[in-house]
Amino acid sequence: MTAALPDLSFHPAWHAQLELAYARAGDATRPVTRRHAGPLRVQKHLYAEGPEVCQHILVHPPGGIAGGDSLAFDVRLGERAWAQLTSPGAAKWYRAACPSRQTLEIHLEPGATLEWLPQESIVFAGAQAELETRIQLRGDARLFYWDMVALGRPASGERFASGHFVAALDIRRDDRLLWHERQRIDGGDRLLDSPIGLAGHPVLATLVASGEIDTDLLQRCRALPCAGRGNLSQLPGGLLVARCLADEALHARAWLIELWRLLRPALLGREAVPPRIWST
């Protein structure tokens, strides 16, 4: 039985902000700023890998994002700090009469490392989801970033027949542009099924990592099984970009995690230790 979606026509808009900053103190990364307004929180910081890597779980208690809602994240890492940020479950963008927005600002000082590893966003038919991410790297700062988006509810047979999804990603190192993209997907658009678009796959995922890998590891990454379509490219300027199209979010997630397992030791010098929250 498929549960009815909540009627959010008269939902009062939430405007939420979360500001996080991390600093290196000796051999440990410590959270030094944690400010929030509205329904955005972080759970207690964890050190599953030891004191060097500070893990935070980002929580949005309402559980869904409706028309007029806005979420703003500001994440800053000082020199040599290392943070890993993830989420406990999917972000749900509900159908709405007006746009819902999320902005993410990331600033990394030299020697800092950020792993931004949230779970998927589900964009329901009729939603108007607009996301903007701006990332500034300084010096030799390191980044491992991914996002996953499911359009409609494929498991329930719901296609993304109306609404829109807009996402912009801008990455710079010392103010020099490394990567910029902007995509807009309209509900019912022919690109959803076109072979030059999503080719009928309702789930799309992107991974961007700073650094370079050798040809052998690149081929091992490309050979990973993918229950959909996935590939990885090494770009000039020291960026790796991976794409995946899949029929279910769990397939895209599994592929990203396997890429992370292969790439993390080479790029970040540590074996991959999946956060426990991914198993709950």
Swiss-Prot record:
Main location (coarse class): cytoplasm
UniProt keyword NAD present: no
GO CC field: cytoplasm
Subcellular location: Cytoplasm
Source taxon at top rank: Bacteria
Keywords: Chaperone, Cytoplasm, Nickel insertion
Entry keyword Chaperone: yes
One of the record's GO molecular function terms: nickel cation binding
UniProt subunit comment: UreD, UreF and UreG form a complex that acts as a GTP-hydrolysis-dependent molecular chaperone, activating the urease apoprotein by helping to assemble the nickel containing metallocenter of UreC. The UreE protein probably delivers the nickel.
Biological role: Required for maturation of urease via the functional incorporation of the urease nickel metallocenter.
Family per similarity comment: Belongs to the UreD family.
Protein name, per record: Urease accessory protein UreD
UniProt gene name: ureD
